[in-house]
Amino acid sequence: KQPVLYVGGGAGMAPMRSHLYHLFKTLKTDRKVTYWYGGRSKRELFYIEHFKELEREFPNFKFYMALSEPQEEDNWKVKKDINDEEGDGFVGFIHNCVIDNYLNHHEAPEDIELYFCGPPLMNKAVEKMGQDFGIPDENIRFMS
């Protein structure tokens, strides 16, 4: 029952949504699943309510967001940490937010199964992140 980490950005939101809905709604997984989604500003975030609903329905699912360039009109309230219920999300590139707020505190990151989908630069950074934290290549999967 390895924990599962999803990291998405940009157009990667759609395939991630499909995969996560199948995992929870169809397969009824009991694995611990965390989804981190990044965009430049709030305008680039989609399906937010869908993921928040999944989070309410399944206690083994956590959803986090990050903006790399939050705009004033976003009124983005920065989370202090992953337990902060009042903040909207984090600020920075999504892979850095995952490292700082999740992987650096994970007791066994090498046991994680990692799925990711997003723009090419993000994909490259997330793949390197997984390797840097000792996640075996067979547990790192790019979704297209």
List the model feature ranges, each with a label.
Residues 25-32:
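Phosphate-handling active-site elements
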Residues 1, 9, 19, 48-50, ...:
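Surface-exposed beta-strand edges and their flanking turn/coil or helix-capping segments
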Residues 34-144:
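Reductase modules of NAD(P)H-dependent flavoproteins
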Residues 1-6, 19-25, 67-69, 144:
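FAD-binding FR-type
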Residues 5-13:
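Short, glycine-rich nucleotide/cofactor-binding loops
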